[in-house]
Curated annotation (Swiss-Prot):
GO terms for cellular component: membrane. The gene is lpxC. One of its GO terms (biological process) is lipid A biosynthetic process. Its cofactor is Zn(2+). It comes from Campylobacter jejuni subsp. jejuni serotype O:2 (strain ATCC 700819 / NCTC 11168). Pathway: Glycolipid biosynthesis; lipid IV(A) biosynthesis; lipid IV(A) from (3R)-3-hydroxytetradecanoyl-[acyl-carrier-protein] and UDP-N-acetyl-alpha-D-glucosamine: step 2/6. This is UDP-3-O-acyl-N-acetylglucosamine deacetylase. The lineage of its organism: Bacteria, Pseudomonadati, Campylobacterota, Epsilonproteobacteria, Campylobacterales.
């Protein structure tokens, strides 16, 4: 298998979740071994998508340095991962990626419009060789070796609408588009005022967020899936793991995980060189490796 980039440049416009301002986004092809690069056109500043460049994980995954930052990258990163794109430049004219409808389906549509192009370099994946786990009390995220990568995610909220939900996701592009990509971000009505007092969630609305009260969902159309909440957490986790620079070939398990725990997990993986192996798919014929890109 070869590395992939986009066949052509595509453009889009959306609202920023936290600042509520219109944002222009452009996805551009990049040459082999470039990785995923964010570029803020208003600052003339580039940020490689990697754990080392993450500066905040409070409400979203944020890349940055002393020049500035780019927030809420995880939904776009998730779609890029699902499509097997290895090299792409993401141009933004603001400090966050647009939220679109709160899921990653709009980014999937942009990638469909762009198409893919094979590059003259072998695709590489990160194969997990031993268990790596990060805990915070009873919350944890874990990567373990596997023959067929899956995500097993459980969430538990003290809320009658959400409660406890679990979902097991088996990696493939088709499975992602059908079962994960349309799952929207969510928030609680009781938190809205506090967030907005901190200049956060200013662009949040029923058009891009599932808003949950104590015992009801405020969105008139309801849920897209009965377990949309945990599916969105899987969407986020895929995006966060993409910061490792490769499709991760390992089982990811989470109980009440978060952007912060995912970030700590990626750092722990990179810290232990015995925990993973970078495998070139040009040198292997194992169908299990190729299956995840189907």
């Amino acid at each position: 298998m070869k590395q992939l980039t986009l066949a052509k440049t595509v453009k889009g416009v959306g609202i920023g979740l936290h600042k509520g301002e219109p944002i222009e986004i452009t996805l551009e092809p990049l040459e082999a071994n470039s990785g995923i690069v964010f570029f803020r056109s208003d600052l003339n500043a580039s940020y490689k998508a990697s754990p080392e460049n993450v500066i905040n994980t409070q409400m979203a995954t944020v890349l940055g340095d002393d020049r500035g930052f780019i927030s809420t990258i995880e939904h776009l990163m998730s779609a890029i991962n699902a499509y097997g794109i290895d090299n792409v430049r993401i141009v933004l004219n603001a400090n966050e990626a647009p939220v679109m409808d709160g899921s990653s389906i709009s980014f999937c549509m942009m990638l469909d419009e762009a198409g893919v192009k094979e590059l003259d370099a072998p695709k590489k994946i990160m194969v997990i060789k031993k268990p790596i786990e990060v805990r915070d009390g009873n919350k944890f995220v874990r990567l373990t070796p596997t023959k067929e990568p899956r995500i097993n995610y459980t969430i538990k909220f003290d809320n009658a609408v959400i409660g406890e939900q679990s979902y097991n996701f088996e990696f493939s592009k088709k499975n992602y588009i059908e079962n994960i990509a349309r799952a929207r971000t969510f928030g609680f009505l009781k938190d809205v005022q506090a967030l907005r007092s901190m200049n956060l969630a200013l662009g949040g609305s029923l058009e891009n967020t599932i808003v949950v009260d104590e015992n009801r969902i405020l969105n008139p159309e309801g849920l897209r899936f009965k377990d949309e909440f945990v599916r969105h957490k899987i969407l986020d986790a895929i995006g966060d793991l993409t910061l490792l620079g490769y499709r991760v070939f390992g089982d990811y398990t989470s109980y009440a995980g978060s952007h912060h725990l995912n970030h700590l997990l990626t750092k722990e993986v990179l810290k232990d060189k015995d925990a993973y192996e970078i495998v070139s798919l040009e040198k292997t014929t194992q169908k299990a490796y190729e299956k995840v890109f189907a």
